[in-house]
Amino acid sequence: GGDLFLTKEKLWPHLPELVDGMLQFYRGVLPDFITSHYADGGYAAALTFKKTGIPFSFTGHSLGAQKLDKLGTTTDNWLSMENRFKFSKRLAAERISMKYAAKIMVSTKQEMDEQYAHPLYISALDQFDKTKFEIIPPGVNENIFSQTPALTDKTLKQKLDAIFGTKGGPVILVSSRLDEKKNIIGLVQAYSEDNAL
């Protein structure tokens, strides 16, 4: 942290070296599939794919084209924005990730239809081929995850009940930064207005 913290943009030139080092470290025991996140992870996965043929998924999370638009980037401020955020490298990495990914993971149809259809991504993937996308909405599949409490669950429940009371409804865990676009207020509102919850 502090003055020793490096922004991720400063690490971009080292991603090919990271991939080479990773392949050397794991030689002979490579995975069958890679999951990648954000532009830098997608780029590293694409480099790995080109060297090994190992397919990968790409989850963009926060795409550069939307950030570029949100920040109001124009021809007048492009140089300062580029120097700070390295948009040209990020957008190129996202386009490469989209092109070579076996699957692109999104959480909503809107994300697929609007964010990935941004003009800066048009030639990176076939906008009409929705089979490349996998929509995985936020939440937990209760058919997969056990509802039978373990001993550690019971201990934790006692601690949480002491703090929050014993209403007995389902717990919702939110793990994200406090950002308006994460719609945490909408989650709290939906939870508080539903009598079953």
What do the PLM-derived regions correspond to, one by one?
Residues G1-L197:
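Catalytic cores of nucleotide-sugar-dependent glycosyltransferases that transfer UDP/GDP/TDP-activated
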